[in-house]
Amino acid sequence: MEPLTIGYIALPVALFLLAMRVPIAAALGVVASVGIFVIFAWRPGADFQPEYAWQPTFSLLINSPFAFITSYTLSTVPLFIFMGHISYEAGFTTDIYRAARLWLSKLKGGVAMASIVGCGGFSAITGSSVACAAAMGRIAIPEMLKFGYSKPLATGSVAIGGTLGSLIPPSVLFILYGIFAEQSIAKLFIAAIIPGLLSLFAYIVVIYIWVSLKPDAAPVPEETVTRADRMSALGRCWAIVLLFVVVIGGIYAGFFTPTEAAGIGAAASLVLGLVLGRLKTSNIGSALKETVYQSSMIFAIAIGGKLFVNFIALTGMAASITALIDGSGASVVVVIGLMVVMYLSLIHI
């Protein structure tokens, strides 16, 4: 059996496993491992010979993930996640949410809109959608329910706001994409700023339309908020603004690389929290524990993805698909449209 045939068989199997809710790391890793073994065992012009496949398969399965995980650039992932969790433990996330809530307090759906803004602010210092949704969920959902917001609106606004963590820099997703695609992470970060802000604004517009159609879903809180309260809350957001400017501004200005920026951001958030008296030993321990949990999950998925990329390279599928697209004569717009459809299909999976 030709490697290309093995690849075209394995791809739908991987998609089927994902559709069956098999963990991503397991689905990609298992399919890639079996596929690599079969390719090495099925030599051209010979029968299936598994005795020749064990050594090269295990060599690839061990060396490739090790080389990937020990990558210097990949260290940005736990560092940015740690920066986000330290900022949450220090209350910086609460500061930006409270400021947004007070400034939007008189609008219908203002608390839900504030959760979106809070997610955007938190995304700017963590880059993890999971950390963003979890942190903002603990802060915003209880408050929205207290004010009489409907549960679908309360939970939905935090869930969709959490996706900003995958778009607004420093996005972990862009870091992994940059490593896999061998692209500049700094350029990816800069390119994501405007789409991230547009997405944030679009989510707010959707909430406004929702509460306009269903006013009972978001009662306006009966509270008195003065201009002094708003300005005071806004002034307390300086820590998050400083961290974002140092990290993203430093990358954009060329002062340091994304990896160096992650280290500086993590150290700066820790120092700020300690100097301001907002962190205790238990807070740091909690941040470290959450960082280990989330980094382990992300690394497991990344290892599965790396093995699958190696498998695809062995099959020659990339060259085959490229030749197919070139030979079809399809325009760039059609190709991009097909890619969008594919991505949307994967989201539903």
Predicted feature locations:
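Alpha-helical transmembrane segments of multi-pass membrane transport proteins
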Residues: 1-349
